[in-house]
Amino acid sequence: MHKMMVVEKERSIEERLLQLKNQNDDSECRITACVILSTFIAVCGSFSFGVSLGYTSGAEIGIMKDLDLSIAQFSAFASLSTLGAAIGALFSGKMAIILGRRKTMWVSDLLCIIGWFSIAFAKDVMWLNFGRISSGIGLGLISYVVPVYIAEISPKHVRGTFTFTNQLLQNSGLAMVYFSGNFLNWRILALLGALPCFIQVIGLFFVPESPRWLAKVGSDKELENSLLRLRGGNADISREASDIEVMTKMVENDSKSSFCDLFQRKYRYTLVVGIGLMLIQQFSGSSAVLSYASTILRKAGFSVTIGSTLLGLFMIPKAMIGVILVDKWGRRPLLLTSVSGMCITSMLIGVAFTLQKMQLLPELTPVFTFICVTLYIGTYAIGLGGLPWVIMSEIFPMNIKVTAGSIVTLVSWSSSSIVTYAFNFLLEWSTQGTFYVFGAVGGLALLFIWLLVPETKGLSLEEIQASLIREPDRINQS
């Protein structure tokens, strides 16, 4: 009897979710100055994220020389950011739901500012590592809350574009480090990493809270005020507000979120997709290549100064392609294109180092390696760099978004920490073998994306829940 009641309840929820489809509201299609400003303020944290990711590439020689660090000590320093981010990820979801999206970003900014200043004024490895962990914890918080916040405030027809600006600003931070790391001291670079955090601290006073979070905590009046600011003062926000409230109440009544809830059959599919994309993003080598681009170029015999400068110049235009295409092509085609490019270029980098080891074409392999590294980073930037976070922010319903988002973010940063720490040692083992492994992961990733990743282009968050309600049937039930 109880089982029949549960089935009937889920069927009722499904029917009500499906009623939300095919509803449209012109006010939801408006792009207002408030949405643009709110997105810009949110992605200021993403710029600091990018600076942190590329910092070890631009500052490696200076830090190791000034503080007399060994390779093992510097590898530990590089990986501590991702270790700290994994710690931050554990609390990111809970903080985002208890404090709200804006206050969570404030906490992140405080931790990042402390971290960057500790690095900038470090006199020994202890303060250097403390700063790296502190800023890492802040990045762990912001890596979850920024894409979620942007997805929750954006009109559905441009949600992918706006959420992908998270990746664009990450690439801007990377570009700044790659370019300016050639002539700025590593301490100055650290201070530049803190600058966008100060901008965000001030800017958050002028942007609204997420309407979906306000609905979850029962602040109906604030929900309407937030939507009016986001959609325009003359917009009719009644239908969108109603859909958000109905969806929130349905998922709240359906079940209260707990860790065990994630493994229910109806959530298993989205959890597999979210975690799978994060594992693909990291074990295809992205963190390693971005963090140690200068090391790779140096091993290939290419000028680090020229290579870093050119990578910095190309970084932002590459990410712009993803911003333009994400709501035109859709998530799946862009992911498949991105991962295909990363797979091919990883294999080609492996071939280049194989030729170098065999002492064949010595005058061509440095340039060939640089071209392949540039294409690898470019194909990463247009898809796999940002889309896992875009999709993560879309596919989880409100009642499990906190727990699921925290787990997915934790997986991302934990795997990134492993790859970042191990990369230098992998290069000592076999440079070409390392990139062949990355290429093989890319090949498996193509199969995963083709079979499992859903298309969410053009759907509201409520419509995505309706479309995914039957997706557990795609996963083999045990």
Curated annotation (Swiss-Prot):
Gene3D superfamilies: MFS general substrate transporter like domains (1.20.1250.20). Its main location: membrane. One of its GO terms (molecular function) is sugar transmembrane transporter activity. The chain crosses the membrane at residues 31-51, 71-91, 110-130, 133-153, 162-180, 188-208, 270-290, 306-326, 333-353, 367-387, 407-427, 433-453. It is a multi-pass membrane protein. Signal peptide: none annotated. GO terms for cellular component: membrane. Pfam families: Sugar_tr. Sugar transporter. Belongs to the major facilitator superfamily. Sugar transporter (TC 2.A.1.1) family. This is Sugar transporter ERD6-like 18. It comes from Arabidopsis thaliana (Mouse-ear cress).
